[in-house]
Amino acid sequence: MDIETANALTAFTARYCDAWHEMNGTWPQSEELYGVPSPCIITTMDDKILWQPQPFSLEQTVNAVERAMDIVVQPAVHAFYTTQFAGDMQARFANETMTLLQTWSENDFQRVQENLIGHLVTQKRLKLAPTLFIATLDSELDVIAVCNLNGEVIKETLGTRKRDVLAPSLADFLNQLEPVL
């Protein structure tokens, strides 16, 4: 596993949870994840849950993606999706506000891998370099992704060759993220 990426993700998650504690006096809350089983759930309330990150309990790889696409996935992406179970987190990098995607549960991990495969299949059809998304933006056409050829974190316009490099590595990117509540 890419320890640098795992540590950067854990550190950002701690910053995010600390910000929730400072602002709200609780662990992060989610209405979207209400009713969705996860080891992260601390408390279920009327229409929301409180969550805290939990250690990832499965094999720490996205091998299903590698097998399906016959590629080797960047080690940083393995670490990103298999370091922890957690809720998605709002974040800011430079002027970009995003939702950092996380694996919520064992079942969610399967769904995440299926979505990554679908993304890669589309890119292959369009003859685009392979990327693996890690965050969504308000614009449904843009995502934050890791280029699988060189490990750079990019802002990518889906279905096009438009890509802007944001950071040389996923660890660098995560270390620069600021929590947004």
Curated annotation (Swiss-Prot):
Pfam families: Syd. This is Protein Syd. One of its GO terms (cellular component) is cytoplasmic side of plasma membrane. Interacts with the SecY protein in vivo. May bind preferentially to an uncomplexed state of SecY, thus functioning either as a chelating agent for excess SecY in the cell or as a regulatory factor that negatively controls the translocase function. It is found in: Cell inner membrane. It is a peripheral membrane protein. Keywords: Cell inner membrane, Cell membrane, Membrane. Belongs to the Syd family. The gene is syd. It comes from the Bacteria.
